[in-house]
């Protein structure tokens, strides 16, 4: 194969910078900012974006997917139960029925986050990696956006001021640490918010508590996924992920309803 590739350093640099600046100018004001690109965050992003709203997902690591990639103790499979399996089927994930267990399936732990991310992006959400949310924007007793910085800057310990993304709603989908709600609680003790953390593993109880705990914790701030159980002291579940996906979908539905009602 005789191919000659055009490679120009100036053109490459200019193209990257122009695309990046155009992108940032487009997303500094959004309908929903989702902090955390794990299973619940990506699920919420897809359902909200499908309704035509502007959504950005902010993930501190260079890879989205949260704890899904490693499956259970490094074995590359996760478990999902009905009816959450339908959420994965919508993005084309291949599921294998667990023999002798009604309504239980396994899924490839690499395929799942990849297809969830593609589903969110194809629906119109913007997924950014390497971005850390270090604080929240508050306006008149309401969360009104996120304060962001480069994760590389944070890791290097450099004293560099952040920038902001304004949003009608913010979602804490940061997993076990519930870092967004924790930050709001720590910086604003007068709000009376507490984050007791999750309880020890009890999969069935944790899965069902997760759905109850997915809610608006403060005006403009929702919590979903494992962050919800951390905020409201639910049990952890391990490598069964159905509750995470349903939590993300429930969070999306609640936010979409508020957006449609201009709340």
Swiss-Prot record:
Residues holding Fe cation: 161, 176
Pfam families: Thi4
Reactions catalysed: hydrogen sulfide + glycine + NAD(+) = ADP-5-ethyl-4-methylthiazole-2-carboxylate + nicotinamide + 3 H2O + H(+)
A single GO BP: thiazole biosynthetic process
Amino-acid positions noted as binding glycine in the UniProt annotation, renumbered to this chain: 236
A GO molecular function held by the record: pentosyltransferase activity
This protein's UniProt keywords: Iron, Metal-binding, NAD, Thiamine biosynthesis, Transferase
Function: Involved in the biosynthesis of the thiazole moiety of thiamine. Catalyzes the conversion of NAD and glycine to adenosine diphosphate 5-(2-hydroxyethyl)-4-methylthiazole-2-carboxylate (ADT), an adenylated thiazole intermediate, using free sulfide as a source of sulfur.
Subunit comment: Homooctamer; tetramer of dimers.
Protein name: Thiamine thiazole synthase
Source taxonomy: Archaea, Methanobacteriati, Methanobacteriota, Methanomada group, Methanococci
Gene name of the encoded protein: thi4
